[in-house]
Amino acid sequence: MTVLLYPEGQEAENGLQEALGPKLSNGITGPEWSDETGRIGSISDSARVDIYLPKKCNGQMIVVCPGGGYRYVSALKEGLHVADWMTARGIAVAVVKHRMPEGHWEIPLIDVQNAFRYCRTHAAEWGISQIGVMGFSAGGHLAASASTLYVDEITRPDFSVLIYPVVSLNRKFVGQGTRNNLLGKDEMWDDKEMKVAEFEEKQMLYHKLLTHYSLQNHINEKTPQAFIVHCSDDKQVPVEHSILYYTRLIDSNVDAEMHIYPKGGHGWGFSSEKWKGKGKDKFAYARADFEETLERWLENIRKM
Protein backbone atom coordinates (compact mmCIF):
# COMPACT_ATOMS: atom_id res chain seq x y z
CA MET A 1 0.00 0.00 0.00
CA THR A 2 1.38 3.40 -0.99
CA VAL A 3 0.22 6.57 0.75
CA LEU A 4 1.00 10.01 -0.67
CA LEU A 5 1.96 12.37 2.13
CA TYR A 6 0.84 15.43 0.16
CA PRO A 7 -1.84 14.30 -2.32
CA GLU A 8 -2.51 17.88 -3.43
CA GLY A 9 1.20 18.65 -3.82
CA GLN A 10 3.71 20.30 -1.53
CA GLU A 11 2.42 23.79 -2.34
CA ALA A 12 -0.89 22.95 -0.65
CA GLU A 13 -1.50 24.19 2.88
CA ASN A 14 -2.51 20.74 4.09
CA GLY A 15 -1.40 17.25 3.21
CA LEU A 16 -2.70 13.90 4.29
CA GLN A 17 -5.44 14.09 6.93
CA GLU A 18 -3.17 12.41 9.49
CA ALA A 19 -0.22 14.73 8.71
CA LEU A 20 0.56 18.34 9.59
CA GLY A 21 0.93 19.55 6.02
CA PRO A 22 4.06 19.92 3.91
CA LYS A 23 4.78 23.30 5.62
CA LEU A 24 7.58 23.98 3.16
CA SER A 25 8.39 23.29 -0.49
CA ASN A 26 11.76 21.97 -1.62
CA GLY A 27 11.44 23.94 -4.86
CA ILE A 28 11.88 20.90 -7.11
CA THR A 29 9.54 21.10 -10.11
CA GLY A 30 11.12 18.56 -12.46
CA PRO A 31 10.03 14.93 -12.78
CA GLU A 32 11.04 12.27 -10.30
CA TRP A 33 13.74 9.92 -11.65
CA SER A 34 14.72 6.34 -10.92
CA ASP A 35 17.29 3.86 -12.19
CA GLU A 36 17.85 0.11 -12.42
CA THR A 37 19.62 -0.01 -9.04
CA GLY A 38 16.48 1.17 -7.24
CA ARG A 39 17.59 4.73 -6.61
CA ILE A 40 14.85 7.39 -6.73
CA GLY A 41 15.60 11.11 -6.88
CA SER A 42 14.00 14.55 -7.36
CA ILE A 43 11.16 13.55 -5.05
CA SER A 44 8.83 16.49 -4.42
CA ASP A 45 5.02 16.32 -4.70
CA SER A 46 5.33 12.52 -4.86
CA ALA A 47 6.65 12.15 -1.28
CA ARG A 48 5.09 8.96 0.01
CA VAL A 49 5.15 6.06 2.42
CA ASP A 50 5.07 2.44 1.23
CA ILE A 51 3.33 0.30 3.86
CA TYR A 52 4.11 -3.42 4.14
CA LEU A 53 2.01 -5.45 6.57
CA PRO A 54 2.89 -9.05 7.45
CA LYS A 55 0.28 -11.80 7.38
CA LYS A 56 0.53 -12.00 11.16
CA CYS A 57 1.92 -8.91 12.90
CA ASN A 58 3.90 -9.34 16.12
CA GLY A 59 3.11 -5.78 17.24
CA GLN A 60 6.22 -4.03 15.93
CA MET A 61 6.58 -1.62 13.04
CA ILE A 62 9.64 0.11 11.63
CA VAL A 63 9.68 3.38 9.69
CA VAL A 64 12.57 2.96 7.24
CA CYS A 65 14.72 5.80 5.88
CA PRO A 66 16.84 4.57 2.94
CA GLY A 67 20.21 6.19 2.32
CA GLY A 68 21.33 8.22 -0.66
CA GLY A 69 23.26 11.23 0.59
CA TYR A 70 20.07 13.34 0.70
CA ARG A 71 20.25 13.30 -3.14
CA TYR A 72 18.14 10.18 -3.73
CA VAL A 73 16.75 7.24 -1.78
CA SER A 74 18.09 3.70 -2.23
CA ALA A 75 14.60 2.26 -2.31
CA LEU A 76 15.61 -1.30 -3.17
CA LYS A 77 18.59 -2.44 -1.09
CA GLU A 78 17.67 -0.20 1.86
CA GLY A 79 13.91 -0.20 1.40
CA LEU A 80 12.13 -3.10 -0.29
CA HIS A 81 14.71 -5.67 0.86
CA VAL A 82 14.25 -4.41 4.43
CA ALA A 83 10.49 -4.82 4.11
CA ASP A 84 10.88 -8.38 2.80
CA TRP A 85 13.13 -9.33 5.73
CA MET A 86 11.01 -7.66 8.39
CA THR A 87 7.58 -8.84 7.23
CA ALA A 88 8.88 -12.42 7.07
CA ARG A 89 9.44 -12.02 10.82
CA GLY A 90 6.06 -10.48 11.59
CA ILE A 91 7.26 -6.86 11.65
CA ALA A 92 5.33 -4.20 9.71
CA VAL A 93 7.34 -1.69 7.67
CA ALA A 94 6.79 1.84 6.36
CA VAL A 95 9.42 2.88 3.80
CA VAL A 96 9.59 6.68 3.54
CA LYS A 97 10.37 8.10 0.11
CA HIS A 98 10.88 11.61 1.41
CA ARG A 99 11.36 14.83 -0.48
CA MET A 100 14.94 15.80 -1.29
CA PRO A 101 16.04 18.79 0.80
CA GLU A 102 17.87 20.77 -1.91
CA GLY A 103 19.16 23.00 0.88
CA HIS A 104 15.75 23.11 2.64
CA TRP A 105 17.10 21.26 5.65
CA GLU A 106 13.82 20.83 7.54
CA ILE A 107 12.05 18.91 4.77
CA PRO A 108 13.21 15.27 5.17
CA LEU A 109 12.42 15.28 8.90
CA ILE A 110 8.99 16.85 8.28
CA ASP A 111 8.20 13.94 5.95
CA VAL A 112 9.42 11.28 8.40
CA GLN A 113 7.46 12.84 11.25
CA ASN A 114 4.35 12.88 9.07
CA ALA A 115 4.96 9.20 8.32
CA PHE A 116 5.00 8.57 12.07
CA ARG A 117 1.74 10.49 12.48
CA TYR A 118 0.10 8.37 9.80
CA CYS A 119 1.38 5.10 11.26
CA ARG A 120 0.44 6.02 14.85
CA THR A 121 -3.09 6.88 13.68
CA HIS A 122 -3.53 3.44 12.11
CA ALA A 123 -1.50 1.45 14.65
CA ALA A 124 -4.49 -0.11 16.44
CA GLU A 125 -6.08 -1.04 13.12
CA TRP A 126 -2.87 -2.83 12.07
CA GLY A 127 -2.20 -4.44 15.45
CA ILE A 128 0.85 -2.27 16.16
CA SER A 129 1.99 -1.36 19.67
CA GLN A 130 5.61 -0.31 19.05
CA ILE A 131 6.96 1.85 16.20
CA GLY A 132 10.67 2.38 15.69
CA VAL A 133 12.83 3.97 13.04
CA MET A 134 15.63 2.54 10.91
CA GLY A 135 18.05 4.37 8.64
CA PHE A 136 21.06 3.78 6.44
CA SER A 137 23.91 6.25 5.81
CA ALA A 138 22.25 9.66 5.22
CA GLY A 139 19.00 7.86 6.00
CA GLY A 140 20.70 6.96 9.27
CA HIS A 141 21.19 10.68 9.85
CA LEU A 142 17.48 11.16 9.18
CA ALA A 143 16.56 8.30 11.53
CA ALA A 144 18.83 9.77 14.20
CA SER A 145 17.19 13.17 13.57
CA ALA A 146 13.79 11.57 14.18
CA SER A 147 15.20 10.05 17.38
CA THR A 148 16.63 13.28 18.78
CA LEU A 149 14.56 16.11 17.24
CA TYR A 150 11.04 14.71 17.70
CA VAL A 151 8.34 17.20 18.66
CA ASP A 152 5.99 15.03 20.74
CA GLU A 153 5.28 11.44 21.78
CA ILE A 154 3.57 10.75 18.45
CA THR A 155 6.71 11.56 16.46
CA ARG A 156 9.13 10.03 18.96
CA PRO A 157 10.33 6.58 17.80
CA ASP A 158 10.10 3.77 20.35
CA PHE A 159 13.54 2.55 19.23
CA SER A 160 16.18 3.18 16.58
CA VAL A 161 18.17 0.96 14.25
CA LEU A 162 21.09 2.85 12.69
CA ILE A 163 23.07 1.19 9.89
CA TYR A 164 26.37 2.92 8.94
CA PRO A 165 24.72 6.24 9.90
CA VAL A 166 25.88 9.79 9.37
CA VAL A 167 25.66 11.41 12.80
CA SER A 168 27.86 14.52 12.81
CA LEU A 169 28.09 17.17 10.07
CA ASN A 170 31.58 18.08 11.23
CA ARG A 171 33.73 18.47 8.11
CA LYS A 172 36.21 15.98 9.56
CA PHE A 173 33.57 13.26 9.68
CA VAL A 174 31.17 13.67 6.76
CA GLY A 175 31.52 14.05 3.01
CA GLN A 176 30.77 17.35 1.34
CA GLY A 177 27.93 15.87 -0.74
CA THR A 178 25.67 14.87 2.15
CA ARG A 179 26.27 18.15 3.99
CA ASN A 180 25.68 20.25 0.86
CA ASN A 181 22.55 18.36 -0.16
CA LEU A 182 21.03 18.92 3.27
CA LEU A 183 22.15 22.46 4.08
CA GLY A 184 22.89 23.86 0.63
CA LYS A 185 26.03 24.14 -1.46
CA ASP A 186 29.03 26.07 -0.18
CA GLU A 187 28.47 28.94 -2.62
CA MET A 188 25.08 29.54 -1.02
CA TRP A 189 26.88 30.33 2.23
CA ASP A 190 30.21 31.70 0.97
CA ASP A 191 29.13 34.19 -1.69
CA LYS A 192 31.87 36.82 -1.58
CA GLU A 193 29.58 39.30 -3.37
CA MET A 194 27.43 39.61 -0.26
CA LYS A 195 27.76 42.60 2.00
CA VAL A 196 29.90 41.98 5.07
CA ALA A 197 26.97 42.03 7.50
CA GLU A 198 24.95 39.60 5.36
CA PHE A 199 27.96 37.32 4.93
CA GLU A 200 28.62 37.21 8.67
CA GLU A 201 24.93 36.54 9.37
CA LYS A 202 24.89 33.66 6.91
CA GLN A 203 28.06 32.20 8.35
CA MET A 204 26.58 32.31 11.85
CA LEU A 205 23.46 30.50 10.63
CA TYR A 206 25.53 27.91 8.76
CA HIS A 207 27.61 27.04 11.82
CA LYS A 208 24.45 26.96 13.95
CA LEU A 209 22.95 24.44 11.51
CA LEU A 210 26.13 22.35 11.51
CA THR A 211 25.83 22.12 15.28
CA HIS A 212 22.07 21.52 15.21
CA TYR A 213 22.29 18.67 12.70
CA SER A 214 25.23 17.06 14.46
CA LEU A 215 22.83 14.84 16.29
CA GLN A 216 25.03 13.72 19.15
CA ASN A 217 24.43 17.20 20.56
CA HIS A 218 20.77 16.36 21.24
CA ILE A 219 21.10 12.97 22.91
CA ASN A 220 19.70 12.81 26.43
CA GLU A 221 17.99 10.35 28.78
CA LYS A 222 14.79 10.51 26.67
CA THR A 223 16.48 9.47 23.42
CA PRO A 224 15.18 6.09 22.18
CA GLN A 225 17.31 3.00 22.71
CA ALA A 226 19.33 2.02 19.67
CA PHE A 227 20.89 -0.84 17.74
CA ILE A 228 23.88 0.39 15.73
CA VAL A 229 25.97 -1.34 13.05
CA HIS A 230 29.06 -0.12 11.20
CA CYS A 231 32.20 -1.46 9.51
CA SER A 232 35.68 -0.32 10.48
CA ASP A 233 36.76 -0.01 6.84
CA ASP A 234 33.90 2.31 5.85
CA LYS A 235 35.59 5.09 3.87
CA GLN A 236 32.44 7.08 3.03
CA VAL A 237 31.02 7.38 6.54
CA PRO A 238 33.75 6.69 9.12
CA VAL A 239 32.90 4.39 12.01
CA GLU A 240 33.46 7.32 14.40
CA HIS A 241 29.89 8.45 13.64
CA SER A 242 28.40 5.32 15.22
CA ILE A 243 30.87 5.35 18.10
CA LEU A 244 29.97 8.97 18.85
CA TYR A 245 26.23 8.23 18.92
CA TYR A 246 26.69 5.09 21.00
CA THR A 247 28.96 6.83 23.52
CA ARG A 248 26.52 9.70 24.01
CA LEU A 249 23.66 7.22 24.56
CA ILE A 250 25.64 5.34 27.21
CA ASP A 251 26.64 8.61 28.88
CA SER A 252 22.91 9.47 29.02
CA ASN A 253 22.01 6.07 30.55
CA VAL A 254 20.13 4.98 27.42
CA ASP A 255 20.27 1.31 26.45
CA ALA A 256 22.26 0.71 23.27
CA GLU A 257 23.87 -2.16 21.41
CA MET A 258 26.59 -1.60 18.81
CA HIS A 259 28.27 -4.05 16.44
CA ILE A 260 31.40 -3.03 14.57
CA TYR A 261 32.58 -5.44 11.88
CA PRO A 262 36.16 -5.27 10.57
CA LYS A 263 35.25 -5.44 6.87
CA GLY A 264 32.27 -4.60 4.72
CA GLY A 265 32.74 -1.02 3.61
CA HIS A 266 29.71 1.18 3.05
CA GLY A 267 26.30 0.73 1.50
CA TRP A 268 26.04 -3.04 1.77
CA GLY A 269 22.32 -2.82 2.31
CA PHE A 270 19.92 -5.39 3.63
CA SER A 271 20.34 -8.11 1.07
CA SER A 272 23.06 -9.78 -0.96
CA GLU A 273 20.72 -9.74 -3.98
CA LYS A 274 22.18 -6.52 -5.37
CA TRP A 275 25.65 -8.04 -5.55
CA LYS A 276 24.77 -10.84 -7.97
CA GLY A 277 26.97 -10.30 -11.00
CA LYS A 278 28.05 -6.88 -9.73
CA GLY A 279 31.22 -7.55 -7.82
CA LYS A 280 32.00 -8.99 -4.44
CA ASP A 281 29.73 -8.54 -1.43
CA LYS A 282 32.32 -7.54 1.16
CA PHE A 283 29.78 -7.95 3.95
CA ALA A 284 28.76 -11.51 2.99
CA TYR A 285 30.84 -13.05 5.80
CA ALA A 286 28.90 -11.10 8.45
CA ARG A 287 25.34 -10.96 7.09
CA ALA A 288 24.08 -14.01 8.97
CA ASP A 289 25.52 -12.73 12.26
CA PHE A 290 24.12 -9.24 11.66
CA GLU A 291 20.64 -10.58 10.90
CA GLU A 292 20.68 -12.92 13.88
CA THR A 293 21.74 -10.23 16.36
CA LEU A 294 19.25 -7.69 14.98
CA GLU A 295 16.40 -10.21 15.12
CA ARG A 296 17.29 -11.07 18.71
CA TRP A 297 17.49 -7.41 19.72
CA LEU A 298 14.11 -6.60 18.15
CA GLU A 299 12.57 -9.58 19.91
CA ASN A 300 14.03 -8.52 23.26
CA ILE A 301 12.76 -4.93 23.09
CA ARG A 302 9.35 -6.16 21.98
CA LYS A 303 9.08 -8.04 25.27
CA MET A 304 10.04 -5.08 27.42
Give the location of each predicted region.
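N-terminal cap/lid segment of alpha/beta-hydrolase-fold proteins
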Residues: 1-57, 105, 284-288
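Mobile cap/lid helix-loop segments that gate and shape the active-site cleft of serine hydrolases
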Residues: 25-34, 169-218
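Short beta-strand element of the alpha/beta-hydrolase
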Residues: 59-67
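Catalytic nucleophile-loop/oxyanion-hole region of alpha/beta-hydrolase
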Residues: 73-83, 94-130, 283-286
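Primarily recognizes the serine-hydrolase "nucleophile elbow" in alpha/beta-hydrolase
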Residues: 114-178, 210
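Short beta-strand/loop motif that positions the catalytic acidic residue
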Residues: 222, 228-230, 234
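C-terminal catalytic histidine-bearing segment of alpha/beta-hydrolase fold enzymes
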Residues: 229, 243-304
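Conserved alpha/beta-hydrolase "acid-adjacent" motif
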Residues: 235-244
